[in-house]
């Protein structure tokens, strides 16, 4: 990754809605043309590895009508607001892979303390690629660790609905790991509550409760609640508007 203006950079991490671009939102794309000098974006490619990597390809792109459709929707709106409020250029590092679990963004040393996680190659390969533990951390996150950022954005949880009892602690462990890698103290960690989707297991409310509990475990964090933002007819849409 080449250098970009250091005034504001955010890491936008995880999940299929983070990974969802603004393509098709024509009004937003037209508006994005005015952000050329204020917003930069780099997408980390979907990559997996059994061991931590030191390099990853990536190229900063300015926000234009031509490039905006590829920008992560969550990251774009956050960056646009930051640029408007702070009056400085903003860079978004889009390090996302849809549908992954919190364990996918955690290192081996921490995962070895979780009795339900199989870290053998056979065990990992027996798991669906986007649900595998550790491999996204190794290939996508570790190479950019230490790159100057001002905070992390996290929109994830659906794939951990059935493991809600462990979620708060595991999310806290992950954030602690990241902060230790970046060596910038308790840099902000903002995360989004999973939508009130009608999960077949009925565990959605328990996962949201675990996300709320994580606030007490993660210093300098903020949870964006979505429970009151969803229309009744969207209960069967895992990613409502």
PLM features per residue range, with description:
Residues 1-9, 13:
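Single conserved hydrophobic/aromatic residue that forms the stacking wall/gate
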Residues 15-37, 46-52, 56-58, 63-241:
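Catalytic-domain carbohydrate-binding cleft regions of carbohydrate-active enzymes
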């Amino acid at each position: 990754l080449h250098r970009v203006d250091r005034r504001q950079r955010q890491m936008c991490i995880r999940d299929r809605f983070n990974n969802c671009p603004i393509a098709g939102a024509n009004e937003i794309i037209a508006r994005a043309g005015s952000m050329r000098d204020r917003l930069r974006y780099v997408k980390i490619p979907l990559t997996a590895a059994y061991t931590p990597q030191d390099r990853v390809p990536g190229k900063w792109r300015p926000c234009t009508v031509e490039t905006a459709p590829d920008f992560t929707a969550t990251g774009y709106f956050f960056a646009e607001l930051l640029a408007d409020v702070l009056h400085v250029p903003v860079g978004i590092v889009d390090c996302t892979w849809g549908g992954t679990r919190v364990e996918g963004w955690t290192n081996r040393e921490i995962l070895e303390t979780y009795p339900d996680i199989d870290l053998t190659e056979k065990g990992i390969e027996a798991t669906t690629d986007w649900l595998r533990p550790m491999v996204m951390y190794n290939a996508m996150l570790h190479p950019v660790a230490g790159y100057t950022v001002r905070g992390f954005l996290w929109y994830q949880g659906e794939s951990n609905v059935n493991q809600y009892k462990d979620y708060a602690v595991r999310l806290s462990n992950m954030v602690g790991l990241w902060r230790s890698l970046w060596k910038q103290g308790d840099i902000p960690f903002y995360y989004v509550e999973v939508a009130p989707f009608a999960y077949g297991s009925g565990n959605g409310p328990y996962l949201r409760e675990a996300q709320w509990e994580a606030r007490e475990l993660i210093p300098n964090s903020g949870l964006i609640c979505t429970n009151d933002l969803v229309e009744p007819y969207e209960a069967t849409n895992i990613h409502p508007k």
